[in-house]
């Protein structure tokens, strides 16, 4: 199995376009208090996030970011760093911009006020457009997924973030403002399974707050947002499709914005997180198909 995974990864590198092949194995990007790392082995999805020098989103082998799907009848996911099936995400184009100028990164970290990555790729039968931008200490991400034929799926995930196991508490807030507040238990269960726009994490030791806001979804009757409480991470992901058909000619859009704050008083962290969510909840109108 290990040989099969290694062969699939090496083959995927030969299939990369010249622009992507010019990128080093890892790219470090810094803007304000945020540092992210992109890795070739994860198809240049984000693979690590730090804030003020603190690790907040992990880069362990099974901690995947980005987009992944599982076709009906398959035990394996495809996309991002998943290579279990031997069928990996294939990067078609990759562009990186620092303060508006396109750059080809080297071994040194790149820094700027505004950093943007644009990527197109294929995942199984899907065409994926992905972009992220780091500006004003906020990470904004947008994913567009389309298919030329009907696809029967078990799951289609996007906006995945494996937040670090350091986080002790969570606060999930729905569209009406109702809160679900609790402590993580690392019991492999999900703290949330419905679509809600506001997810918040808190680390009592450091006082770090992470807030992510997902734009309303208008795709799929089974769309939802998950918060998986594991020992290795506290993972957030948007499920665009679950046990349903992804119709040909349609485009699914996932938009997520992430910000950070600090509050050492644990009695005040939820109110601070709510305030941060209001700042993050600024999305342009969704594109008409």
Describe each model-derived feature in a short phrase:
Residues 21-34, 39-43, 199-289:
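Beta-strand-rich recognition/accessory modules
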Residues 184-192:
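Extended amphipathic alpha-helical segments with heptad-repeat/coiled-coil character used for oligomerization
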Residues 1-5:
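Positively charged n-region of N-terminal signal peptides that target proteins for export
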Residues 8-17:
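Bacterial N-terminal signal peptides
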Residues 116-123:
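Short beta-strand segments that buttress and anchor functional surface loops
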Residues 135-177:
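Acidic (Asp/Glu-rich), glycine- and aromatic
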């Amino acid at each position: 199995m290990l040989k099969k995974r290694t062969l699939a990864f090496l083959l995927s590198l030969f299939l990369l376009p010249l622009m992507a092949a010019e990128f080093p194995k890892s790219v470090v990007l810094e803007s304000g208090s945020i540092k992210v790392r992109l890795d070739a082995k994860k198809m240049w999805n984000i693979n690590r996030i730090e804030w003020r020098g603190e690790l907040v989103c992990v880069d362990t082998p099974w901690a995947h970011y980005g987009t992944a799907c599982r076709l009906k009848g398959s035990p394996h996911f495809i996309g991002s760093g998943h290579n279990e099936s031997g069928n990996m995400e294939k990067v078609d184009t990759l562009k990186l911009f620092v303060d508006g100028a396109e750059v080809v990164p080297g071994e040194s970290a790149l820094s700027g006020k505004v950093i943007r990555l644009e990527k197109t790729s294929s995942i199984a039968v899907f065409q994926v457009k992905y972009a992220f931008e780091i500006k004003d200490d906020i990470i904004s991400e947008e994913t567009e997924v389309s298919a030329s034929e009907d696809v029967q799926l078990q799951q289609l995930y996007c906006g995945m973030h494996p937040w670090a196991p350091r986080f002790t508490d969570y606060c999930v807030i729905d569209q009406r403002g109702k809160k679900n507040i609790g402590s993580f238990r690392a019991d492999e269960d999900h703290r949330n399974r419905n679509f809600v726009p506001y997810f918040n994490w808190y680390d009592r030791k450091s006082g770090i707050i992470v807030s992510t806001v997902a734009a309303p979804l208008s795709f799929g009757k089974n769309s939802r947002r998950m918060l998986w409480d594991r020992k290795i991470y506290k993972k957030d992901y948007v499920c665009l499709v679950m046990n349903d058909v992804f119709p040909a000619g349609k485009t699914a859009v996932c938009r997520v914005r992430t910000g950070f704050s600090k509050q050492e008083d644990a009695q005040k962290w939820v109110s601070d997180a709510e305030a941060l969510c209001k700042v993050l909840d600024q999305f342009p109108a969704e594109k008409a198909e």
